[in-house]
């Protein structure tokens, strides 16, 4: 997927508002913990783009994001 759009992500979450919150949580987690080895090609992209791509491609679910946020 060359470009991530909101429409790609809305299939995975209920509303645009949920998408904003979840993507920001995931982007903050990426910035805090750094890019993993599996994200090596994505280091050129901003964390928000990586987070949106993960959501769109179902690499991470809203439940996983929320669980990670609660666990710290």
From Swiss-Prot:
Catalytic activity: RNA(n) + a ribonucleoside 5'-triphosphate = RNA(n+1) + diphosphate
Keywords, sorted A to Z: DNA-directed RNA polymerase, Nucleotidyltransferase, Transcription, Transferase
Gene Ontology CC: one annotated term: DNA-directed RNA polymerase complex
An example molecular function term from Gene Ontology annotations: DNA-directed RNA polymerase activity
SUPFAM superfamilies: RPB6/omega subunit-like
Single biological process term from Gene Ontology: DNA-templated transcription
Pfam family, one: RNA_pol_Rpb6
SMART domains xrefs: RNA_pol_Rpb6
E.C. code: 2.7.7.6
InterPro entries on file: DNA-dir_RNA_pol_omega (IPR003716), Pol_omega/Rpo6/RPB6 (IPR006110), RPB6/omega-like_sf (IPR036161)
Family: Belongs to the RNA polymerase subunit omega family.
Function: Promotes RNA polymerase assembly. Latches the N- and C-terminal regions of the beta' subunit thereby facilitating its interaction with the beta and alpha subunits.
Subunit structure: The RNAP catalytic core consists of 2 alpha, 1 beta, 1 beta' and 1 omega subunit. When a sigma factor is associated with the core the holoenzyme is formed, which can initiate transcription.
Protein name listed in UniProt: DNA-directed RNA polymerase subunit omega
Organism: Francisella tularensis subsp. holarctica (strain LVS)
Gene name of the encoded protein: rpoZ
